[in-house]
Amino acid sequence: MSFTVIIPARFASSRLPGKPLADIAGKPMIQHVFEKALQSGANRVIIATDNENVADVAKNFGAEVCMTSVNHNSGTERLAEVVEKLAIPDNEIIVNIQGDEPLIPPVIVRQVADNLAKFNVNMASLAVKIHDAEELFNPNAVKVLTDKDGYVLYFSRSVIPYDRDQFMNLQDVQKVQLADAYLRHIGIYAYRAGFIKQYVQWAPTQLENLEKLEQLRVLYNGERIHVELAKEVPAVGVDTAEDLEKVRAILAAN
């Protein structure tokens, strides 16, 4: 099975400007992500960026680069531009890895592509079990609820499903007994290239605007998303300077 990885790499970031080029163990962060993608067995890895400095650095370490507009509102819009510019066939499997995931396990990059290929869906993703009550109640940890076959019912920053008996009069989060039903969504996606072009034709929805989760546009428009449990739990991504130091420490220890 062949698949293409596209890595969106925005230079402008409100919390950590210039993070694709942040040094981690002697390499820019985007190079770590690129190398992990190559290790997944992808037949093609493309860095999509709106910044010439990122493009120059990426070309220097041997990456294929596609320059994109600075005006995109989401990573999926950036992917759609790449698909159009490079005339990627509609049936090609595209895996979207964020440019701030330098520790992403290559095995789950391939897993999400395999997941899409196995099921009759246009979009697939991964999740991990939630074992910590604080994570369950953290709105930055996106929860996903699926049916018995792994097809997504809903994504939310709220707790889903809501355990009425435990949570109605909850005083201490630490006393929560977690059920197996709680899953945290991992922000890695696989799609058919043609579906990416379809996605950007749909108008943003009230659901996605409320939750700030663009994948809800897919469910709203009647398409199915399949989610599997990730074979390996990914380490921290880089959103802040504190995250960057954590990743540096992890790589230094190894």
UniProtKB/Swiss-Prot annotation:
Localization (cell): Cytoplasm
This protein's name: 3-deoxy-manno-octulosonate cytidylyltransferase
Species this protein is from: Haemophilus influenzae (strain 86-028NP)
Pathway entry: Nucleotide-sugar biosynthesis; CMP-3-deoxy-D-manno-octulosonate biosynthesis; CMP-3-deoxy-D-manno-octulosonate from 3-deoxy-D-manno-octulosonate and CTP: step 1/1; Bacterial outer membrane biogenesis; lipopolysaccharide biosynthesis
Enzyme class, broadest EC rank: transferase
Name of the gene this protein is made from: kdsB
Annotated catalysed reactions: 3-deoxy-alpha-D-manno-oct-2-ulosonate + CTP = CMP-3-deoxy-beta-D-manno-octulosonate + diphosphate
Keywords, in A-Z order: Cytoplasm, Lipopolysaccharide biosynthesis, Nucleotidyltransferase, Transferase
GO biological process: CMP-keto-3-deoxy-D-manno-octulosonic acid biosynthetic process; lipopolysaccharide biosynthetic process
Record's GO cellular component terms: cytosol
Annotated GO MF terms: 3-deoxy-manno-octulosonate cytidylyltransferase activity
Free-text function comment from the UniProt entry: Activates KDO (a required 8-carbon sugar) for incorporation into bacterial lipopolysaccharide in Gram-negative bacteria.
Family per record: Belongs to the KdsB family.
EC assignment: 2.7.7.38
Major location (coarse): cytoplasm
